[in-house]
Amino acid sequence: FSALGKHKQALMEVVSANDLRILSYGVDPNYGPDDIDLIDQLKYQLMNANMEQNGTLGKWMMRNTTSVQINYDIASEKDMEDMTFVADCLQPVSAYLFANSPFQFGKSTGNQNLRNVIWENTDNHRCRNLIDHDINSQEGLIDRYIEYIMTVPGIFELNETGMIVDTNQTLGERLINLETKGELR
């Protein structure tokens, strides 16, 4: 908890020095995506264009939501598969507990879990749960997930010089091309 305490102390110093408040919301309570500038980097521009084609609320996700991230400590491949599957099955409960999105444009969202609605309609290739992507049990989860992500169209990649460029090539296609050229390390 020492690291957490240091992080919180640093955060509170910035908040205090800048007369800010911490709000525990999963979605910006007052503004829509058209009110918030997109981060001015090519990868975000490419993601934005992709999400406008592959979901209805990608702009909202990129500009108005916060993320919930969980780290696990694992001891084995089986441990990882079991924990990942159980955590994914518990995702709806976690979304309900931590999404905290009671307002949109300053008005009550009622019983709607707005943050979860946004993420469910962001990008069907990359979002949702494992079962939505035909991974229905923990047995062989890692291999089945790898098989799945090898078929997902890319958004951007690093070219030979390390620059971000757009792509719709899948990771599987990219790896085959690199192997064919003898460039796969």
Language-model region placement:
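Loop-rich catalytic cores of soluble enzymes, especially ATP-dependent carboxylate-amine ligases
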Residues: 13-17, 21-185
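Membrane helical hairpin/interfacial module
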Residues: 1-12, 17
